[in-house]
């Protein structure tokens, strides 16, 4: 049994596009080859969730609540580099964990800051052309798409310190 869904080798772009990374005609691939996951350039906004809670109703039946989800696109630092995911930057999404997640069952997380609430994700919305790959400066200098400290709620910053992007890449003028 796998510990996480990331324990199995991922499907790669090269599984179908054999010469994608070796093609010297794609300058962005040559420049960013081992620094960015493919999704950083080829994914769109996707679903994020927050504040999942469990509990028991007046009859003692378990229930779950969740704040409304939202669409967002964020690039974060990769805190869990592996041979299959060696990239410095990956697409991240907010997951609905919090200290009170299982409070209704009498379980309190002893250290909610031990695990980030912004996690690496592999969205299923890959496209060749996306807003962030329209030009170099559609990404470089665009703080809106990076998981900066301002994009993280103050009470989640400690847990996400290894995912938060300290400095947005500077504009290139291209």
Residue ranges of each PLM-predicted region?
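C-type cytochrome heme-c attachment and multiheme electron-transfer modules
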Residues: 1-174
